[in-house]
């Protein structure tokens, strides 16, 4: 009888969902679906990906969503024409498939998964897999390694904060974010400058949960149309009744 009760308790007990990371490693998934603070994302369809011209990237070829490419090229052109940037912005890391993310995340298995997740999102939990996110680099680097906090002090990074939202880009992980993800001033995602921009609705749907629960900073502010009420029409005033003159008899 006791064995039956124990078995029943085990069946009815709530199971803890886990994300499979590396071989023999897993991570508990929180109630809101996050693993080590990161939200889940799927792979971008290959048919929707294009390669950024090589002159705008460093290292491996940069692959992004086709809908995002025009705004990214306009951003690079604007930065290149602004002397305040004092350098050149380049794409460092763009779309990464879940399989590629797994190889990146698991290559440092000497440390714990929790420690690695501070700087690298677990496979299946990276914005890079969507094709809408990228890491920027500055050239010349002037002693600041790529993907390090020192980038925030560069003129190019300051230019990004002031101007990137005009091109539909927002900083996913600002300092002190409630998502408890490492501050990444180099990491930006595209959601379109307006909801009517081509492909923006799809991108905003992909990031809808992140944008609602953990707002970007700077973020792309949604357009709010305000209508001013027309001035009230004057109330017509009835003319005073005319006094009829009495006729003399």
Features from the language model and the residues they span:
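N-terminal signal peptide c-region/cleavage motif recognized by signal peptidases
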Residues: 12-16
């Amino acid at each position: 009888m006791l064995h039956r009760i124990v078995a029943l308790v085990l069946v009815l007990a709530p199971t803890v969902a886990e994300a499979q990371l590396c071989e023999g490693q897993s991570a508990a998934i929180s109630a809101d679906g996050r693993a080590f603070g990161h939200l889940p994302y799927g792979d971008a369809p290959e048919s929707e990906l294009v390669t950024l011209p090589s002159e705008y990237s460093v290292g491996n070829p940069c692959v992004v969503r086709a809908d995002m490419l025009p705004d990214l090229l306009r951003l690079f052109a604007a930065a290149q024409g602004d002397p305040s940037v004092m350098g050149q912005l380049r794409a460092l890391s763009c779309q990464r498939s879940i399989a590629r993310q797994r190889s990146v995340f698991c290559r440092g298995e000497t440390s714990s998964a929790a420690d690695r997740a501070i700087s690298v999102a677990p496979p299946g939990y990276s914005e890079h897999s969507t094709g809408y996110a990228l890491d920027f680099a500055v050239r010349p680097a002037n002693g600041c390694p790529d993907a390090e906090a020192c980038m925030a002090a560069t003129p190019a990074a300051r230019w990004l904060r002031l101007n990137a939202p005009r091109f539909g880009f927002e900083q996913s992980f600002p300092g002190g974010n409630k998502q408890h993800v490492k501050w990444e001033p180099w990491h930006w995602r595209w959601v379109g400058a307006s909801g009517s921009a081509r492909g923006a609705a799809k991108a905003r749907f992909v990031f809808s949960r992140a944008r609602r629960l953990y707002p970007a900073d700077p973020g792309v502010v949604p357009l709010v149309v305000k209508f001013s009420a027309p001035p009230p029409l004057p109330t017509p005033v009835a003319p005073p009744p005319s006094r009829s003159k009495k006729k003399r008899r």
